[in-house]
Amino acid sequence: MMMDKRGIKKIINEVTPDIIAMRRHIHENPELSGEEVNTAAFMAEKLRSFGVEVEEHVAGTTAVLGYLKGGKPGPVIALRADMDALPMTEETGLPFASKSPGKMHACGHDGHMSILLGAAEVLSRIKDDLSGTVVFICQPSEEKSPVGGAKGLIASGALDGIDAVYGLHVWPTLPSGTIGVLPGPMMAASDHIRIVMKGKTSHAAMPHKGVDTIVAAAQFLTAAQTIVSRRVNPLYPAVLTFGKITGGTRYNVVADTVEIEGTCRTYHEEAQDAVETYLQDTLKGMDAMYGTESTLYYERGYAAVRNTPVQADFIAGVVRQCLGDEGLADVQEPAMTAEDFSGYLQHFDGGFFWLGATPQGQTVYPLHNTHFAVDEKCLPIGVEIMVSLVLAKTA
């Protein structure tokens, strides 16, 4: 079958019931990061049924790679979907809601996987006319920040030889079926911060005989908020949030240990470097003032997801060809949430985009919300864009 636009849409219409059925099966059978055993087996089974060569347990994980070789020589283009769910109890009320209490596809990975499988089914039908090879990446542990699943997969060398890789994320704040893409950063770098402050216990009535880590921690948390407002270049956005603090053993004992955990989100390495440096400097000041001994554990997690201007224009052009100008959402700014797809873009050419997933007029539930669910009408559109990206790169 010739790979014209009309022919592709016809195939997508034919396989849309399969796409929806696969999405519903995945949605009601969620598995957490690193535990995607049944999910991976399902992905492998479906890929094989489309005539795709499959490799399982890649890099010693649940990762699955599928290879579809076209009838003509050409580049190697990869499409990626993440497989893991979140430790949340679903409240969508869907007839195909999660069957596993405390586990839910609340970040749309069920949509990502069904789109990947849909793209595989479509491309397999036209493989004789396809130039090059398509690699389907079924990645575990995207939610397992700050390590994630992409890093190990890339480091294993299993993806060596790829010429370009493309990924998407369903996006509830965009109208269903529209595409959002930006040059430069689209999603933020995500770093994990852990601080341990050590002091000395004493009776609460004799605080001068101890070293109070709770007081020191309180001062540190206040002082740290000036890092973003006064030490980081204001042209480089940064978010510094501490979401957890633990310390003390009893109400009338001066606490000798406090642990603080938080995250830093940035788009630029300059801001990332500045936050880490000034956190360390602030802790040194607290130690000098209060007599504490503090240790900063600053773990750099996912890098920022960045599209080159060339790739952003390429994706936008494909969207216009498929959906017209109205298919491109008016996206003005990136997000401070993170995605380990950035790891692929640090090693390979490629790009990333958002797929609108909420019907107009309906309540917008954010990602990681117990009520979030992907609008199934956006799924065939995601398939069309993924397939069209492959065809445009291999033409």
Positions of predicted regions on the chain:
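Acidic/His- and Gly-rich active-site-bordering loop/insert found
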Residues: 2-105, 110, 114-130
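Histidine/acidic-residue-rich, glycine-tolerant segments that coordinate divalent metal ions
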Residues: 86, 92-104, 111, 117, ...
